[in-house]
Amino acid sequence: MDLIRKNYAELVQRMGRTIAVQITNDLFTRNILSMGEMEEILSCKVAQDLTRELLNVILKKGTESCTRLLQSLENQDPFFYEDLIGQRVQSGVTEEDLENLADHLKRLYQYPFFKKFNPLGEDTDIDIIFDLDRTFTDPLLWRKGTLNRREKQLTLSEMLEQLESPCVIEGEAGKGKTTILKRIAMLWASEKCRALADFKLVFFVTLRGASEGLYETLSDQLFPITYSWNKKEFLNKIWHLGRKVLFLLDGYDEFQSESCTEIEELIKNNPKFNSTVIVSTRTETIGKLRRCGALIAETSDFSLDNAKQLIANVLEEDEANGLLFQLEESSFMQNLMKTPLFVVIACALRMGESDFQMNTQTTLFSTLYDLMVEKKKYKIRHLSANILAANIRKFGDLALDGLFEQRFDFNEKHLSKIKEEVLLNIGLLNKYTAQRRKAVYRYFHTTFQEYIAGRRLSQLLSSEDNSDVTKGEDFLNKIVSVFDITTKYKNLLLYTCGSSKVATQKVVKHVAEVHKHDKNNYSTELVEFGLNLFFESSTKKELSQDFETLFSEKCLYINSHNISSHHIEFFLYLPNCLSALQLIKLDLSGTFATVPSESTMDRDSKSAQSSVCDNYIPEKAVKLFFDWNQSIQTLEVTLRDFHQLNKKDIKYLGKICCSADSLRLNIKRSSGITGSLVGVLESCKNIQDLNVDSTKLSIEDERRIVQMTEMKTLSILNLHSEHLQGGLLEGLCNLVGLEKLVFHNIKIDKNDAKTLAEGILSLKKLKRLSISHISNIGDGMESIAESISLCCHELKELKLIDCCLSAKALRSLGQSLYSLSHIEILDLSGNYLLEEGKESVEELAANLTHLDAIRTLMLPGGTDVKFCLEAVLPTLRRIPTLSELAFKRWNLTNDDLMTLASYINSGFENLSFLDLSDNCAQSAGWLSLTAILQYLPNLTYVNFSTEDLFTPDPDLVRKLVRAISALPLLHTMELNNWQLDDFDLAQIKKAKNMIHR
């Protein structure tokens, strides 16, 4: 007993955990220790604590128990026992001893025990193991200077080649610091790293488990049980080796420096020992090491490739593919995966554990949160559960207040009611002191602050305490626009709904109420947000009626390449919301690759077939729309860049389209449709609208189109093939239910135009007609204009743009305006009248008073139309509904603009769009017009572009800047051909931040 008391301190320092555990087990088998005593001793995490507890228990039991302990020590560690009783004949540490130790360490660093680790921490109950051989990805590090700024990016190899001691590896939680140090040890053990070849010994030390001295720590963590040297001799030998010894010290942020001053000295007074040191630490403790660090390297973010490599190496193929797909479809996930810990947690959630299903962002953060609190409980075990819970609540309030104040940096004042040690020790908060007078605190990830805030808001909204509920609702009421809902507070609301069904119900109700009173139309953004909100809430069908208010009479866009779990669950669990949607847009895209030539297909049919197969409509799109029993109001399907379409595609398309009551079909740049459109139209009998763009049609296609007598809309765009006799134009008369007809940039001649005119005679229900960018049709427009005048009395929108409109055709239209009284939009721009233009425009203007509802008037240009300006303007002034007006290519001069200005200053207050482009005025004319802009307060668009290059006077620019700055709604101003210098542009951008083109 006296021997133990006399050598108590040395026993505590030198025994080590391994020997202490073996002695404890031995004494239990000899019935000296009870089961309870053994469990109490072994529960100690730190080696010295375990040894101290063992000695205290034995000393209380008396002399016989002490004798048994010494006997056990003699059996387990005879060298230490002989040292203790003074019988050991000391021998020096030989070169052979060091060689044997080096061999032992190299074997240790190659053992599974060292290479395999639990990425979620040894203190968790989750049995997931990673292997460094498979999971390590080459990290990037930032070299930092004295001012704590990133100076240069380094690979691990480059850092080792430039190594200076002590080297500090800095990084936030989960950034892979431990992995880097272990990798260095493994590289040394492999003897394949040139930068590490000169090191005779490499010691990897976990500072959290450090003993009361450096030698004791090495003995406890690394030495073989057969070592036969004493502390003084060994350390002297190590110090003589100098820079040839590398210490890898992991986790300075968890190091109790007062318990092991030797290691603290080794780091901070490194020149005294002359050994090489690499130490890792978290950001909040970097301030303790910056002064002594010769090289400070900060761990960089994971690249997307790093994340993908880790996922592929860790998971089984099916599990990896699922997570990789989720990573591809979510920019949010890509951002999170920059932090290795998030990749690890995402992998853990995919590993088939029943408690870990990777469904939502909330799941990821909730798992991380629980792990951090559970893993670091040992650091705060001295605090009661009530104190911990209170600080966690205040921590949530801090996050919530910060979000609504747009604050992500906090100071000591903000943490005045919180125990700082709780949050720092758990790892929920990071502390930054480098190059700062006052410490700054941040959540270790911005999105993590949003999660903590959402978690807290969810607790408030679902609380049984009315004061908490009121507090939560007060936060919700601060969100007053759809824009804020879908941008600034998007993640906050997602995490709120991901944490509670009750909170979800209240959030959905609030969002619907905000949208109801928001004057701006953000319907598309709101639907996308609602989709994410539903998925995050994991409520399935429970709140289907609540969600219906978010989707009613709105539009949902889906791209076939980005069909996600959100869409699948939405279709599966919320069919009532699908039916409530006014429109669903489905974009089916083929490949953009060049279609193989016939010769290539003959030479390599397999390759060609593979290329073609890439164009197939994906099965997941079919399953999404076909596997349910509700009905969509309107479905708009776009086939884009399909270079091949086979029977399977047509069948799939039919299955998709049959789910809707009404179908819109858009075909763009799809050569594979040519000749196959017949089959498509046969399988999609509910087509109401058909739009064909840059896709050639066969005669069979055209004939099938004109048989679709129930069709409401037909648009043919950018078709440069010759007109096929007996096709579309000849059969147009069959489409008697047509309400909208568009021909844009198609190839037709004079005779084709007359055929088109004959077809228009039958379209008595037509409400919108657009013929644009068509040339070489001679006087064919006269026939078309006559047909419009005779039969299209229901027209609301008439656009005849750049289509060879003649004065005669214009006069025909003008004379019939009394029968076209429903027209709201009349666009005749892009046409240039050569003869009798003045008279025809005058006649048109005189009859505009018959158009009670006209809002848009784009007049044609011409050689002499400017001479009717004074006759036209009084008529236009008498049209109160006019909001858009164009005098493009009117050859207006300074005098003409002055005339225009004299009329526009009164009676045109509702004008929002004014196009005066391609005219001939100079500064004086533009000055007169600029002066009256103040009388047009509703202007949103102005075009003052000139036909020729124009250098404005400085006074014009100054007054124009003043004028546009006073127009609150103006967002676009075109000044093409104005020669503006940098000073001019700077002033214009300062006034409205608009770009000169």
Curated annotation (Swiss-Prot):
- InterPro entries from the xrefs? CARD, DEATH-like_dom_sf, Leu-rich_rpt_Cys-con_subtyp, LRR_dom_sf, NACHT_NTPase, NLRC4, Nlrc4-like_WHD, NLRC4_HD
User: Which region ranges are annotated with the description Nucleotide-binding domain (NBD)?
Assistant: 95-300
Example GO biological process: apoptotic process
Print the keywords alphabetically.
Apoptosis, ATP-binding, Cytoplasm, Immunity, Inflammatory response, Innate immunity, Leucine-rich repeat, Nucleotide-binding, Repeat
Chief subcellular location equals cytoplasm
Location in the cell: Cytoplasm, Cytosol
Where is ATP bound in this sequence? 171-178
Q: Can you name one GO molecular function term for this protein?
A: ATP binding
Spell out the GO cellular component terms annotated for this protein, sorted alphabetically and separated by semicolons. cytosol
Which segments constitute the CARD domain? 1-88
LRR repeat residue numbers: 550-570, 629-652, 708-731, 735-758, 760-785, 797-820, 821-843, 851-875, 884-905, 908-935, 937-958, 972-994
Q: Among its keywords, does the record have Nucleotide-binding?
A: yes
Q: Which residues form the NACHT domain?
A: 165-478
Q: Which domain of life is it from?
A: Eukaryota
Region entry Winged-helix domain (WHD): which residue ranges? Answer: 358-465
Q: What does this protein's UniProt record list under function?
A: Key component of inflammasomes that indirectly senses specific proteins from pathogenic bacteria and fungi and responds by assembling an inflammasome complex that promotes caspase-1 activation, cytokine production and macrophage pyroptosis.
Protein name (record): NLR family CARD domain-containing protein 4
What gene is behind this protein? nlrc4
